[in-house]
Amino acid sequence: MEIILFLTMMVMITYVFSGYLYRVALVQSSRVDLIFTRFENMCFKIIGTDLEHMSAKTYVKHFLAFNGFMGFITFVLLIVQQWLFLNPNHNLNQSIDLAFNTAISFLTNSNLQHYNGESDVTYLTQMIVMTYLMFTSSASGYAVCIAMLRRLTGLTNIIGNFYQDIVRFIVRVLLPLSCLISILLMTQGVPQTLHANLMIRTLSGHIQHIAFGPIASLESIKHLGTNGGGFLAGNSATPFENPNIWSNFIEMGSMMLLPMSMLFLFGRMLSRHGKRVHRHALILFVAMFFIFIAILTLTMWSEYRGNPILANLGIYGPNMEGKEVRFGAGLSALFTVITTAFTTGSVNNMHDSLTPLGGLGPMVLMMLNVVFGGEGVGLMNLLIYVLLTVFICSLMVGKTPEYLNMPIGAREMKCIVLVFLIHPILILVFSALAFMIPGASESITNPSFHGISQVMYEMTSAAANNGSGFEGLKDDTTFWNISTGIIMLLSRYIPIILQLMIASSLVNKKSYHQDKYTIAIDKPYFGVSLIVFIVLLSGLTFIPVLLLGPIGEFLTLK
C-alpha cells in the first residue's frame, strides 16, 4: 500500500512541478526572478557569454567543448589529489586508467564506480569533482533535451543558448532542490562534515576506522540529478547515506522528480500555452509507466518468492541476501527498479545478490533505456522510439510518416536507426571482448550463467549511463576501466549529436498544415503500438544473450 501511495504522490508532484520547469525552459518571468536573476547574470559574466541564440551546430560545439574541458580538469585532479588540500585521511592518487574511468563516468552522468569511495578519493575531489560534475552533467543533459524540444514543438524558431540553459537549470532547479533535500537528509541522520574518519575502539579491543564526510550535500544531487555515485562504497545501502525508511523515500522521490516532470513538460510545450499537458505526452507517460509497473511487479514477485534452492531445504521467505533489514525485500526491489528505470545507478541493496528474474528486471530497463530515463536524455531516447513507431505504423497502414506535422524522411530514418543501434552494439561487442581478451574474464567471480550476467550487467550499465553493477565483478582492472570508459563516452555523446541533428532536420522541412492522412499520436492505440515496438525491437536484440544469463540461471534453479 505504501508503494502505491508513494508512486501516486510522485505522479501528482511531477505533474505540478512541470509547470515551473516550463517557465524555466522558455525563459519566462516568474516570482523567483528577484532571487535568481542577479546570481545568473554573475555566472554569465564569469563564463563570458553574451546570451546570443545559437544554431544547432554551435549549440552542440559548446556542449562538447564545455564537457571536454570539465573532463580534462577532472582527470588531472584525480591523478594529483594526494598532494592537494582537504585530504585528512591521506588518500593516494588514482591510477591513470582508473582516473580515466572515473572522470568519464561522472562527466557522462553515469557514476560507474570502480574505485572505493572511502579510500580512493579525497574530500576535495568528492566535492569539486564528483559533486560538481553531478550538477553539470545533469544540467547538460537537460539543456540538450530542451534545445531538442524547442525545435520539435515549434514553440520558438530558435534552439537557445547552451550556457543560458545550463545556468538557469542549475540556479533555479538543481541548487534550491539540492539544498532542501540535503537538509531533509541531515534531519534523518545523514552526516555533513569535513572531519577525518572516526577512529573507535570496538568491544573486542580492536581499532576501527569509520568513514564519513560531506555526505548529505553529495547525496542530494546524486539522486536529484540521476547521478548515482555514492560517497561510500556501499552507496545507499549504508546507514550514513540512507539511514531509514524516510530517507529511502526521499531518495527515491528525488530520482523520479525531474525525469517524470520532463515528460509532462514536453506535453505543456506541445499545448503551446503551458497550462495543460497535451494528450500525446500523457499517452507516452502512461506507456512508460505501464512498462515500469510491469518490471516492478516481476522484480518484487521474484524477490518475495525467494530462492527455490533454499525452499527445497525447508527455508521459506523472501530473498534477503544482500539486502538491508530496515528496507526489506519490497522497498529494496522498488529502489532497484527506480534506480535503473531513471538511470541513476545508486543502490540500497546488492544487485549481484538479486534472484535471477530479480536481476533480469533492472537489466531489461537499462537495455531499453527509455522508461523515463535520466535527466533530459531519457526523454530524447524515448522520442527516437516514438519516431520509429510513427514511421513503421504509418507505412503499415499506407499513411504519410509525419510527426507533429513534420515529414519523416530517409535522412532522419538513417540517424534514428544509428541512434537505436549504438546502444546494443556497444553492449554486445564489448561483452564479447570481455570473454575473448586474455585476463579480462578473470574478473568474473561466478561461474556459468551468473558470470555472463555479471559481464552483461556491467556493460549495459555503462552503455545506459546508469552506473549500478553486479559488484561481485572485480572491475578495477585496466580492461574494465578502459572499456567501460569508452562505452560511457560513446553512448553519451554520439546519440545526443544525432538526436539534435534529427530535430533540426525535421524542423527545416516542417509543413504547417494538418495532413488527414497521418496517424493519430494522441490516441491509446498509439501508446499500445509504442510499447509493442519497444518490446519487440529490444527483445529481438537482447533475448539471445539474456537466455545465456539471467533466464538460463532461473531455469537451472530448482
From Swiss-Prot:
The chain crosses the membrane at residues 1-21, 66-86, 127-147, 166-186, 245-265, 281-301, 327-347, 354-374, 377-397, 416-436, 482-502, 531-551. One of its GO terms (molecular function) is P-type potassium transmembrane transporter activity. The keyword Transmembrane helix applies. It is a multi-pass membrane protein. Its main location: membrane. It is found in: Cell membrane. GO terms for cellular component: plasma membrane. Keywords: Cell membrane, Ion transport, Membrane, Potassium, Potassium transport, Transmembrane, Transmembrane helix, Transport. The keyword Transmembrane helix applies. Belongs to the KdpA family. Part of the high-affinity ATP-driven potassium transport (or Kdp) system, which catalyzes the hydrolysis of ATP coupled with the electrogenic transport of potassium into the cytoplasm. This subunit binds the extracellular potassium ions and delivers the ions to the membrane domain of KdpB through an intramembrane tunnel. The system is composed of three essential subunits: KdpA, KdpB and KdpC. This is Potassium-transporting ATPase potassium-binding subunit. It comes from Staphylococcus aureus (strain MSSA476). The gene is kdpA.
